Amino acid sequence: MVHHYSMSCPDLEAIEQVEWEFSRQLSRRRLEQELGSREAAADLSELSEGEKDGKPDTHPPPAAAAAEAAADDGGGGDHQQQQQQPPPHQLSRFARINSDPRIVSDEEEEVTTDRNLYIVLISIHGLVRGENMELGRDSDTGGQVKYVVELARALAATPGVHRVDLLTRQISCPDVDWTYGEPVEMLTVPAADADDEDGGGGSSGGAYIVRLPCGPRDKYLPKESLWPHIPEFVDRALAHVTNVARALGEQLSPPPPSDGAGAAAQAVWPYVIHGHYADAAEVAALLASALNVPMVMTGHSLGRNKLEQLLKLGRMPRAEIQGTYKIARRIEAEETGLDAADMVVTSTKQEIEEQWGLYDGFDLKVERKLRVRRRRGVSCLGRYMPRMVVIPPGMDFSYVDTQDLAADGAGGAGDAADLQLLINPNKAKKPLPPIWSEVLRFFTNPHKPMILALSRPDPKKNVTTLLKAYGESRHLRELANLTLILGNRDDIEEMSGGAATVLTAVLKLIDRYDLYGQVAYPKHHKQTDVPHIYRLAAKTKGVFINPALVEPFGLTIIEAAAYGLPVVATKNGGPVDILKVLSNGLLVDPHDAAAITAALLSLLADKSRWSECRRSGLRNIHRFSWPHHCRLYLSHVAASCDHPAPHQLLRVPPSPSSSSAAAAAAGGGGAAASSEPLSDSLRDLSLRISVDAASPDLSAGDSAAAILDALRRRRSTDRPAASSAARAIGFAPGRRQSLLVVAIDCYGDDGKPNVEQLKKVVELAMSAGDGDDAGGRGYVLSTGMTIPEAVDALRACGADPAGFDALICSSGAEICYPWKGEQLAADEEYAGHVAFRWPGDHVRSAVPRLGKADGAQEADLAVDAAACSVHCHAYAAKDASKVKKVDWIRQALRMRGFRCNLVYTRACTRLNVVPLSASRPRALRYLSIQWGIDLSKVAVLVGEKGDTDRERLLPGLHRTVILPGMVAAGSEELLRDEDGFTTEDVVAMDSPNIVTLADGQDIAAAAADLLKAI
C-alpha cells in the first residue's frame, strides 16, 4: 500500500489510463450485452398465431417437468428443445447420442443398476494422480485436482455407472514424479467387478486416470501455455474414447449369434463428457461434437471475472494481462463451452448471476424466457442457452474417524492430554500424527486455539490480508495462534513467480509484526496429513478461515466442517451457499481486515457460539457427501440432456481385418488369425491401457504393444495390393489406410478460384500420393466453396472429381462423395450430425444486420442465394472494410442466443455461416471416425494464408504441410481484432506435426517424402 507514494507521475498517468480504458470497454460491452438481451427477449415475447391458440408444433418430453423443477430449485435454466431438426429419414440414420432420461433422481427411493454407463471427465492442467496428490505445489495443482479425482471415484461407485475415465495430460518430465508419465492409473474397481469370474467384461469397470500426451513431452507446462496443444489432446482423446466405446460394446452388448460372426457390436458411447475449467471445456466441446454425445462443463474459476478484477486493480494494461494469462484465449474457450454445453455445473447461484452473466453466451433473462417457451412446448426461434444447475461439491468422509471426532474439540481431558504429549519429552505413551509436532514446534504457547488457513500460495487466496488482520490485532494474537498451510516448498527462490511472491510477502509480514512463536508455516505436508491438521485445530477449539478474494467452490470449508471446525469465509463465491446449508460460521469481506478480525474474535471468544457452529456443521455435513452429489448430478444430466429426437448410437461400420495386420498382432500366426476375435484377456486389458499408437517410446511394454496391435487389427481394413490400378478399388468406408487432404484456399483478389494455382496443388497432391501404398491412400478436398463450385473448379483444372474420396464443402457444412456417381448429393448422415443446435432461417436475417460495419450499405453484406444450402447461409461481401470481423459477429450472435460458426472465404468476398458442429476440421474428424482412419495417418496440405478457419486446420494429431506460394489472397484480416488472442495461442508452429516447406525447395519431392511418414 506504500507503493503508490513512490510512483512517478508517468506511472500514475499510466494507471489512470488503464482504469479509464477499462471503464470505457466495460461500459461498451455491457451496452452491447443489454442490446442483444433486449432484442432476443423482444423476439421471444412474441407468440405466433398457432402458439397463441395453444397449438404448438412440438411437445416437451416427459422429463421436462422434473427438469424445470430442478432448474427452479437450482437457480438455473432448463434445457431448451431444439426446433431445427433434420428430416426424419436423416434422424433415423444419424441421431444425436443422448443420455438415458430414465436415470433416477436423488429423491427416488429405488436405484436401478443395469445402466452400464460410461462417463468421461476431462481436467488437463496440473499434476493429477490418485494418491499423494501434490496439492499446492503450484497454482495449477489445487482443489480442482482433488475434486475431479474424487468425483471420478464417486461416480464409478454409483449404481448404474460402469466406467469413468478421467482424461488429463501425460507428463514425462524429470522435474515431476514418474507417476505423471504413466499412461493409465487405476482409481477404483467396483467390488462387484472384482468378484466377477465369468470374464464377461466386469474387469472393464471402475475409474481410471488416462494420461494423453500433447505438446512437448519432456516439459511440465503451465495452463497458460497449453492452449496451442489443445487440438492434439482432442485427437488423442477421440481415439481413446472411440476404442473404449467399441471394446465396451463388445463386452457389454455383443451382437446376438443370429447376426452372424462378422456382426459389429453396438458401441457404448459416453453418457456424458464433462470438461473442468476453460481448457477442458473446449476439449469436451470438440469431443462431444465429434461423437455427438451430451456435454457438461464446470468453470471452477472464470476468465471474465479474473479479467475484470485485474483491470480494476489498474496495475497491468490489457495487453500485458493477455500476454501473461492468455486471458482472451481462455475466455473464448469458456464461450465455446457455453455454445456446446447441455448443462453447466455451478457451486452457487451467485456464480450464475454475477459471473456467468458476464459472458456473451449466457443471459439469465433470455434463458428464463426460453424456459417458459419450453414449458409451453413452443418454438425457441433457433435460440439456445445452456442450463445452469447448482450442485454443491462432494467430500470423501471415509477419512473422518468418528470416534476421534466425538472427542475432538469437546474440551475434555483427551484434547489436553494429546497436546501435553507433544510438549512433554516423554511422548512414547501414545503415537500421535507427526504433522502435529511439525506445526506445534512453531508456537511458544501451543495450548492456544488455532486459526487455520489452508490453500496454495496464490495471490487470489488473500493470505496477506489475513496476516495483516492478525498482526494488527493484539487481542487476536493473545487469544490464538495462526497456522498457514501453503502448499509444499524446498526453496522459495526456485518456485514459480506468483507462489514465490506470496511466500516472500508472508515472511516479511511475520517479521514486520514480530509474529515469531505465534505463526506456523511448515514447509512440507502430505495429502494424508490434511485430516490430522484439521483435527489438531479442532482439538484446540480453533477456527478455519478461507479469506480468498473469490472462492469458486470452497471444498476446504466443507472439509473443516467435517472435522468439527467452525469457519470464517469469504462472501464471494461458493461459501455463501455452503454456509446457508451448514450454518457453521461467518461470512466476511475479504478486503476488510477489520471485518476478518471481528469475525475470528466472535467465534474464538464466545465458546457457546463456537460449539453451536461446530454442532451445526456436523449435523448438516451429509448434504455434501459424494453419494448425494453423484445422485444429484446424474439426475440433472438426465433432465438436461433429454431430446425429443429418436435415440440411436453413432454408426461405426465394421471393418474386415487384413491377414497381414492379423499376423502381426498374433506374432506371425498367419492368415488364419485374421478372423479371430480379441481374446477375453486382451479385450479386458485394452480398456486399461491407453498408449499412443504412433509413439513407440510411450509403450508400456511388449504386452501393451500386443494389445495395441490387437485393437488395430479390430478396426483396420483390407490393404489393397499396390499397383498402377490401385485407385480403381472402391471408395467404400474402410478401404483407406491414410488420407491426403487438400485444404489450400486458392483464390484471386476477386474471390474467384485461381485455376492455375489449384491445378498445381491438385497435381502436386496426386503425384505426392503415388507410391507403393497408393491404393490405401484416399484424397479429400476441403474448401469454403459449395459442392457445385468445387466440382467445377476441379474440372477446370483437368482433375476428375471422382478421384477424390470426399469433398468437404461450404466451410464444413456439407460432405459429398463424388465416386458414388453423377448425383453429387450431400451426405445425409453428416447433415443430421451438424443439424444439432442450428438456428436455421431464424439467424439468416440477423447476420447482415449485425455484420455490416458502421456506414455500410445494405448491398455490402447481402445474402448470396446461389451459395446457400440447408446448413450454410452464405453472404456476399463487396468490401472487406465494410464488414465486421468474425469474432465480433459471433459475439453479437451469442448475445442473442444464436450458436454458429462463421468463416470468411474466397478472399474476404463471402461469409459462410454454418452450424456449431460444422467446420472443416470437424468434418475431417467425422470422416476419420466413420471410416476408421487413425488421424496420425492423415496429412493436410494448406497454404501460407487462406480462409479465416485456416489456423484451425493446422494443429492436431495429423501431419500438416504448409506449401508456399500457392495462395494469392487470404481472408485472415477479418478474423479477430488486435486486442484478442493470436494464432500462436491456437497452434504451436514449432510442433513436429507441422512442416513448412521453403521457397525454392522441390515441393513435390519434399511433400512426397513427408507423406511417406503416414
Swiss-Prot record:
For biological process, the GO terms are:
sucrose biosynthetic process
Taxonomic placement: Eukaryota, Viridiplantae, Streptophyta, Embryophyta, Tracheophyta
- The protein's name is Probable sucrose-phosphate synthase 5
Q: Which PANTHER family match?
A: SUCROSE-PHOSPHATE SYNTHASE 3-RELATED, SUCROSE-PHOSPHATE SYNTHASE 4
Tell me the tissue specificity: Expressed in germinating seeds.
Enzyme class (EC, first level): transferase
Keyword Transferase on entry: yes
Cite the record's Basic and acidic residues compositional bias ranges: 29-41, 49-58
Q: Which family does it belong to?
A: Belongs to the glycosyltransferase 1 family.
User: How's its activity regulated?
Assistant: Activity is regulated by phosphorylation and moderated by concentration of metabolites and light.
Catalytic reactions on record: beta-D-fructose 6-phosphate + UDP-alpha-D-glucose = sucrose 6(F)-phosphate + UDP + H(+)
Which NCBIfam families does the record match to this protein?
sucrsPsyn_pln (TIGR02468)
What are the record keywords, sorted? Answer: Glycosyltransferase, Transferase
Annotated EC: 2.4.1.14
The pathway noted for it is: Glycan biosynthesis; sucrose biosynthesis; sucrose from D-fructose 6-phosphate and UDP-alpha-D-glucose: step 1/2
Q: What induces it?
A: Circadian-regulated, with the highest expression 1 hour after the beginning of dark period (in 14 hours light/10 hours dark cycle).
Gene assigned in the entry: SPS5
Q: What does this protein do?
A: Plays a role in photosynthetic sucrose synthesis by catalyzing the rate-limiting step of sucrose biosynthesis from UDP-glucose and fructose- 6-phosphate. Involved in the regulation of carbon partitioning in the leaves of plants. May regulate the synthesis of sucrose and therefore play a major role as a limiting factor in the export of photoassimilates out of the leaf. Plays a role for sucrose availability that is essential for plant growth and fiber elongation.
Task: Specify where the region named Disordered lies, as residue ranges.
Answer: 29-108, 648-677
In terms of Pfam families, this protein maps to: Glyco_trans_4_4, Glycos_transf_1, S6PP
> How does the annotation summarize its subunit structure?
Homodimer or homotetramer.
